[in-house]
């Protein structure tokens, strides 16, 4: 598993690559606030098995990445979204034609922020957005969208996930699971295999042609 360096503004990010580049399709995996890119190590190979290279990025201040991750303020520049856009740019420089984003909790909000400005093929959020997002911002998210959340999410994300989903433009899909798990904790729940399969299949489907 090689480690790549990504320039995001004046900062250097570390990212773990699963699979090979160049590739037709790749996914950027974005971690939550209490873990880092290594937390995707058991998830990323599932994408590779479906022909999708996976780049698990460490946001600023996490596991070797320089800088510090900033706080989210709606409508303001936000470093995690900028970091995700930098990862997308690196993949395109490496010959990737279709880029998907998958983010959990903080990472899900970062993926949404990036997808408001980048022409990504698809974006998947897990337990995100945790905080409310204005409808006009959710409407800007590009590509195919899949929101995945536990109905009893311990951080109370479910209502904000639903509100954001309603404001999204199609194509879009929402999956609520019975439980209270948050972020990557969903993968360890009884419904975890079903949730993982739904996410991987959604990303691997790609665009027609």
Predicted segments, located by residue:
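N-terminal cap/lid segment of alpha/beta-hydrolase-fold proteins
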Residues: 1-19
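Short beta-strand element of the alpha/beta-hydrolase
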Residues: 24-32
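The serine-hydrolase catalytic nucleophile loop
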Residues: 33-45, 158-159
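Conserved alpha/beta-hydrolase
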Residues: 48-69
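Alpha/beta-hydrolase active-site loop
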Residues: 72-94
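Primarily recognizes the serine-hydrolase "nucleophile elbow" in alpha/beta-hydrolase
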Residues: 86-142
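Short beta-strand/loop motif that positions the catalytic acidic residue
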Residues: 141, 147-149
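Catalytic histidine-centered segment of alpha/beta-hydrolase-like enzymes
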Residues: 180-191
């Amino acid at each position: 598993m090689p480690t790549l360096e990504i320039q995001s503004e004046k900062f250097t990010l570390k990212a773990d690559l699963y699979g090979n580049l160049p590739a037709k399709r790749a996914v950027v995996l974005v971690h939550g606030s209490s873990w880092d890119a290594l937390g995707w190590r058991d998830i990323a190979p599932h994408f590779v098995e479906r022909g999708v290279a996976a780049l698990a990025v460490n946001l600023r201040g996490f596991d070797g990445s320089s800088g510090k991750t900033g706080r989210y303020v709606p409508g303001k520049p936000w470093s995690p979204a900028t970091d995700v856009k930098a990862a997308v740019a690196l993949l395109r420089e490496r010959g990737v034609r279709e880029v998907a984003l998958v983010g959990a909790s903080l990472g899900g909000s970062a993926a949404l922020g990036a997808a408001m400005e980048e022409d990504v093929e698809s974006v998947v959020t897990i337990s995100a957005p945790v905080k409310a997002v204005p409808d006009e911002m959710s409407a800007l998210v590009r590509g195919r969208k899949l929101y995945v959340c536990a109905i009893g999410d311990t951080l109370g994300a479910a209502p904000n996930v639903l509100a954001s989903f309603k404001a999204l433009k199609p194509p879009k899909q929402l999956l609520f699971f019975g439980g209270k798990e948050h972020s990557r904790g969903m993968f360890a729940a009884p419904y975890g295999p079903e949730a993982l399969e739904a996410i991987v299949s959604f990303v691997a489907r790609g665009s027609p042609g």
